């Protein structure tokens, strides 16, 4: 015989709350879900995403680990 009352209570209209405002409803095991970020205010979904300049990071990595450009190595070899 299966055990009774082992499953959590299901709330079909659980409120998702972001910054004190109900942003959507969904099914969950808690009546209220508090979130910091959701698709309505996430930069990726709102189109306000910033493009990061990774060239500086690559240059910093190359400098840190001594992997300079090949141009500098050729110049040193010809001297």
UniProtKB/Swiss-Prot annotation:
<dbReference type="InterPro" id="IPR042105">
    <property type="entry name" value="Ribosomal_bL31_sf"/>
</dbReference>
<dbReference type="GO" id="GO:0006412">
    <property type="term" value="P:translation"/>
</dbReference>
<comment type="function">
    <text>Binds the 23S rRNA.</text>
</comment>
<dbReference type="GO" id="GO:1990904">
    <property type="term" value="C:ribonucleoprotein complex"/>
</dbReference>
<dbReference type="InterPro" id="IPR027491">
    <property type="entry name" value="Ribosomal_bL31_A"/>
</dbReference>
<dbReference type="GO" id="GO:0003735">
    <property type="term" value="F:structural constituent of ribosome"/>
</dbReference>
<dbReference type="GO" id="GO:0019843">
    <property type="term" value="F:rRNA binding"/>
</dbReference>
<keyword id="KW-0689">Ribosomal protein</keyword>
<dbReference type="GO" id="GO:0005840">
    <property type="term" value="C:ribosome"/>
</dbReference>
<comment type="similarity">
    <text>Belongs to the bacterial ribosomal protein bL31 family. Type A subfamily.</text>
</comment>
<keyword id="KW-0699">rRNA-binding</keyword>
<keyword id="KW-0694">RNA-binding</keyword>
<comment type="subunit">
    <text>Part of the 50S ribosomal subunit.</text>
</comment>
<protein>
    <recommendedName>
        <fullName>Large ribosomal subunit protein bL31</fullName>
    </recommendedName>
</protein>
<dbReference type="Pfam" id="PF01197">
    <property type="entry name" value="Ribosomal_L31"/>
</dbReference>
<dbReference type="InterPro" id="IPR034704">
    <property type="entry name" value="Ribosomal_bL28/bL31-like_sf"/>
</dbReference>
<dbReference type="InterPro" id="IPR002150">
    <property type="entry name" value="Ribosomal_bL31"/>
</dbReference>
<keyword id="KW-0687">Ribonucleoprotein</keyword>
């Amino acid at each position: 015989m299966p055990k009774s009352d082992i499953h959590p209570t299901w709330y079909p209209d659980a409120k998702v709350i972001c910054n004190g405002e109900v942003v959507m409803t969904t099914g969950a095991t808690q009546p209220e879900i508090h979130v910091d970020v959701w698709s309505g205010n996430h930069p990726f979904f709102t189109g306000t995403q910033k493009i990061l300049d990774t060239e500086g990071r690559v240059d910093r990595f190359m400098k840190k680990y001594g992997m300079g450009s090949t141009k500098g190595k050729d110049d040193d070899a010809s001297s």
